[in-house]
């Protein structure tokens, strides 16, 4: 049988991003709840994360990235969703080949490896030179996996716009993980048919076979 791959997103898939968004609120001097509510409103109207900053007059947010990154210090065990390691091990035990390919700074790949995620393929958008939802991101991801048939790859992510729709367009099996701000706020277009919709990575492990 042809090898099947499970390719995982990072933010709100393996990593709970509450800490990084809370640090942004602190940097801007905004109550955390207020900042997170504004982020949710931006998502609900179809905006990008960067659209939250002008709400608080922070047009200079790019100049503040370094300060926030210093405070964040990269991924830690405390940032992992509780099911992340279980799912990684469970998918491997079921014979799936594993990749992690996501929109992230390049340094995140080494941080994930340090946390025990030894995926066969690990690539971040900054190092790839292209980001989701660009189709070239998914083409490059397939190339890094050795160019399997797209239908042999399940791409797992929380965002409809960045993960589900473009992975369907690439011919992959789209798996929508409904958690995190984007996962619970965004809605699927009526025409979109992901291969699988799950609420957790534990559910993913139990139901991944249904993606095919």
Indicate residue ranges for each PLM-predicted region.
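N-terminal helical cap/lid subdomain that shapes the substrate entry/recognition surface
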Residues: 1-96, 106-109, 118, 124
């Amino acid at each position: 049988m042809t090898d099947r791959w499970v390719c995982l997103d990072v933010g709100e898939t393996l990593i709970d991003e509450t800490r990084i968004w809370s640090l942004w609120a602190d940097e801007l001097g905004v109550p955390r709840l207020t900042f997170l509510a504004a982020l949710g409103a931006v998502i609900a109207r179809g905006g990008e994360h960067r659209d939250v900053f002008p709400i608080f007059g922070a047009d200079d947010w790019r100049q503040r990235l370094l300060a926030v990154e210093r405070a964040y210090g990269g991924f830690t065990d405390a940032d992992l969703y509780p099911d992340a390691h279980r799912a990684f091990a469970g998918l491997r035990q079921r014979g799936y080949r594993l990749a992690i390919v996501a929109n992230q700074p390049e340094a995140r790949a080494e941080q994930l490896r340090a946390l025990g995620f030894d995926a066969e393929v690990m690539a971040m958008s900054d190092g790839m030179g292209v980001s989701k939802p660009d189709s070239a991101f998914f083409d490059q991801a397939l190339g890094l996996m050795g160019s399997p048939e797209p239908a042999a790859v399940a791409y797992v992510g929380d965002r409809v716009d960045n993960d589900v729709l473009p992975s369907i367009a690439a011919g992959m099996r789209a798996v929508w993980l409904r958690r995190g701000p984007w996962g619970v706020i965004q809605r699927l277009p009526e025409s979109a048919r992901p291969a699988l919709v799950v609420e957790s990575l534990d559910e993913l492990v139990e139901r991944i076979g249904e993606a095919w």
